[in-house]
């Protein structure tokens, strides 16, 4: 038998390249491949994050542009409208439960807050008393206009239906095209009836007494004389009696 060689023959790859397969070099190549794959994965993640940041920045720019185009006091108006809507919902809830809204509101705030709100209200809208009829009518007009609550749902619906004609120009013809809804007409009639009832309550005409002494020149002067008699009558009663008897000094 031929003698068995102790050393095996080299592989064809090793014979051609002349490089031996070193385990250390193979491990180094695997480590380099893993690092390269890790770097590529991180690069893809950074690329996705950059695209997401670019998208968010664009959205913020659009929102900021919308805010800049709004009126200066838009945020304050929006907050106030939201607060008024919450108050209206609370009032409806109290009516459904059969409770008094003013009483419920006072139970939810402290006495100090209630006094502070009352001072602010009087400072903002002071009651200076009666000065003339024009001022009284103006105060009534302002009070009634403050009671008008905006209906944002109908406003948005009307704006959607009108389209570009919602903001009229010099060539727009919108006069006489608005038709009030039945709920609005009923609300106006109810409010007018309340005003009439309140006016009759506070200024109902007294029946005329034919036997009473006439010490006035007109109805307004008669009211003034009655008011003066109510406040100063007890001090002037003796003087009037002396004048009537002719014994006044």
Curated annotation (Swiss-Prot):
Residues 1-22 are annotated as: Disordered. One of its GO terms (biological process) is mRNA splicing, via spliceosome. Pfam families: SYF2. The keyword Nucleus applies. Identified in the spliceosome C complex. PANTHER family: GCIP-INTERACTING PROTEIN P29 (PTHR13264), PRE-MRNA-SPLICING FACTOR SYF2 (PTHR13264:SF5). Belongs to the SYF2 family. This is Pre-mRNA-splicing factor syf2. The gene is syf2.
